[in-house]
Amino acid sequence: MNKTTFKQSALCTMTKAYFLSAMTMASLTASAQQAIFDKLNTTSPEVHADGSVTLRLLAPKADTVTVTGDFKPVDWQTLPMTRNEQGLWSVTVPALPAEMYMYAFNVDGVRTIDPGNTYVNRDVTTLSNIFVVSHEPGDKGYNYKSNATPHGNVSKVWYDSPTLKMTRRMTVYTPAGYDGKKRYPVLYLLHGMGGDENAWAELGRAAQIMDNLIAAGKAKPMIVVMPNGNPNCEAAPGEWTPGLYTPGHWTIKQKAAATMEDSFDDIVKYVDTHYRTIAKREGRAMCGLSMGGGHTFGISLLMPRTFNYYGLFSAAPSFRNAMRGKKLDDVLKTDTQVQQRIAALRDSKPQLYWIGIGKTDFLLESNNALRSYFDSVGMPYEYYENEGGHIWRNWRIYLDMFAQKLFK
């Protein structure tokens, strides 16, 4: 083979190799683009101007499809969906009040989320799609959305907890304009059983609520700290050493080194050290839902002069050592240590002790027992009772109301 023939052969080989490589890359690129850029043809949910909402699911081989959502004021509702000739199932939910709604489909007996709706929340192990209905600025739906207002920042922060002997994660909201120069008050916002440091930011829409309240001048700019209330866990499922385990109330079996109440001062010290806070009682508030309301109640007795504002949302008030199978009412009437701690709380004169609960909440009896005892010993509090039960819809309302009462 002469030099000319060799060069032509080599060039031909290189050209073929380049062509095959280019075709392979084009194929891979097309595949990657399909995953990134393809848009589902099915629009779901479609929120109409009157607040009605159309939900759709393409399932041509399905026999029965229904949707279940919290479309009623205080309860979930299951609606049948209708199939067209192309196998597209749909239903239009009648006009809804301003609110954030959750829903999921049921296809031939199998619960599934809406593939046309990328917005999904996790509540313990349950995944649900969400959508928001708003009719005018300032209504509940508006307050749960991101609007054209100044936005605060949301950070996931790791802190050291000497009491629990672990490094733990929490979510911290800093208001728009926070620059490390001005000092701000702090609201500690606690989740319920099965939740974690993500719960209030995701299910509770805490950042959106605070952004909108502050922008409207209804709430003072404040830092909001959302810790993980499970003292035997470092962080939310998938965010620490055990890895991608299935979330659950008692999935992690290891015993905590201390209680949430006993370890809470670790959080306060970290926040006061790392943020520009008003590091005194007048600059601190605390509230929580369900278990977090119980933690708030316990901390108010354990540290009565650390916080000036307390909020119990559908709270589960209890006394660790005193309960032992007893009803709350009996403990309040007979346990002298509990009585002394409530007296100390009363005498500390907090600016606000706020209790909110739904009329059908299973913890209503316990909250009534606590209020009755407070009345008997002259412990001041504000009480709010509304429709509904132990649901996020109520807890978002309570946060909205409580935040407007703080630091004024």
Model-based region annotation:
Residues 1-14:
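N-terminal secretory signal peptides that target proteins for export/translocation
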Residues 27-29:
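N-terminal signal peptide c-region/cleavage motif recognized by signal peptidases
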Residues 32-33:
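Boundary of Sec targeting at the N-terminus
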Residues 39-41, 77:
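Non-catalytic C-terminal accessory modules of carbohydrate-active enzymes
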Residues 42-46:
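Short beta-strand segments of immunoglobulin-like
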Residues 47-77, 82-408:
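Non-catalytic cap/lid and distal C-terminal segments of serine-dependent acyl enzymes
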